[in-house]
Design a protein with these regions (language model features):
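Short, acidic, metal-binding catalytic loop of nucleotide-sugar glycosyltransferases
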Residues: 22-33
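A conserved acidic beta->alpha catalytic loop
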Residues: 23, 39-49, 66
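Glycine-rich, basic loop-to-helix element that forms the pyrophosphate-binding segment
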Residues: 63-82
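Short beta-strand-to-loop acidic/aromatic patch adjacent to the donor-nucleotide binding site
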Residues: 85-97
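Conserved donor NDP-sugar-binding/catalytic core segment of glycosyltransferases
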Residues: 97-143, 150-154
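A recurrent flexible, glycine/aromatic-enriched loop bordering the glycosyltransferase active site
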Residues: 154-160, 166-187, 209
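A short, conserved alpha-helix in the catalytic core of glycosyltransferases
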Residues: 178-229
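Non-catalytic, C-terminal membrane-associated alpha-helical segments of glycosyltransferases
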Residues: 244-254, 258-303
Length: 303
């Protein structure tokens, strides 16, 4: 029997969190035992759950009086459970729905030699596609949000393979990747013990790209497994294209690049950052300023 700890962060989005948990109760768990932790990450919407409704997934709700971000929230859950006996730690976004065999398939792939992390094929939730009007009705729910990921080192960006494409079998081969999204990421406990979980300086965005690079540098492989399927609402708690995006993506791209990019790209990032200080949007400028001031974590952002 293999044991999995599932870590879910809740932030002002009760409907999504409840739907996510309901999907977990339908998982095929033969040979698996799961324990699920929902961390209320400083939210104000009064998450109320009937724990007895989720006995199959052994649910525990934790309260965090402040919003510690994606990084701090998952780190808090891991700190809570690190002394327990378990094999795998699953990071799961609360605006996600797991297909019933998803977790079983992911864990089976962990038996492959050298694999330290596995991610599934992820679709946009039906009706939540970026450009839903351009698809046929029968294509909705089959549009990729993520079909594996990679780091574009020429631009220092973490990229989703296949995003906005309809699934026509073009990404049906499992493969090794160098960027695993934190939306649904299964990790071996031994990996976290060796490299730790998230660098809390990121707060949110680029934290999963940073974790991926540390996994690879520790000698482990990251596997994309297309037979495992998940649906994701996309930016359910942050909102795509927002000032929040401007701030954290700008600041954290600098942090990620200075940690992991080549010397040539580091020099390019410095030049680009100087330009952004004069031509960027308000929160892009603030993100650059805070990077140089080493103001990380939640930083200066205020909605």
């Amino acid at each position: 029997m293999q044991k999995i700890i599932i870590s879910i962060l809740h932030y002002n989005n009760s409907k999504d969190t409840i739907n996510c948990l309901k999907s977990l109760t339908g998982l095929v768990l033969s040979g698996l035992e799961i324990e699920t932790f929902v961390l209320d990450n400083g939210s104000k919407d009064g998450l109320t759950l009937n724990i007895s409704d989720f006995s199959k997934i052994n649910l525990t709700v934790l309260k965090n009086p402040k919003n510690s971000g994606f990084t701090g929230g998952h780190n808090l859950v891991y700190e809570k459970v690190q002394d327990k006996e378990f094999d795998f730690f699953l990071l799961l976004n609360n605006d996600s729905i797991m297909e019933s065999h998803c977790l079983k398939i992911l864990t089976e792939k962990m038996d492959t030699n050298g694999i330290g992390a596995v991610v599934p094929k992820i679709y946009f939730t039906k009706g939540m596609e970026f450009h839903k009007n351009k698809y046929e009705k029968n294509e909705l729910g089959k549009v990729f949000w993520y079909a594996g990921g990679y780091v574009d080192w020429n631009n220092v960006q973490s990229k989703h393979r296949g995003v906005d494409e309809v699934d026509k079998g073009q990404y049906d081969e499992e493969c090794e990747i160098d960027f695993a999204t934190g939306a649904c990421l299964l990790l071996k406990k031994e990996v976290i013990r060796q490299i730790k979980l998230f660098d809390e300086r990121y707060f949110l965005y680029f934290e999963d790209a940073d974790l991926s690079q540390r996994i690879l540098k520790a000698g482990y492989k990251i596997l994309f497994e297309p037979k495992a399927i998940l649906w994701h609402n996309n930016a359910g708690s942050s909102g795509s294209g927002s000032s929040l995006h401007d701030y954290y993506l700008t600041r954290n791209r600098m942090l990620f690049g200075m940690k992991h990019a080549s010397l040539k790209m580091k020099a390019h990032l410095v030049r680009e950052s100087i330009k952004l200080l004069t031509t960027g949007r308000q929160w892009q400028k603030k993100g650059i300023q805070d990077f140089y001031l080493q103001k990380f974590g939640a930083g200066s952002f205020r909605p």
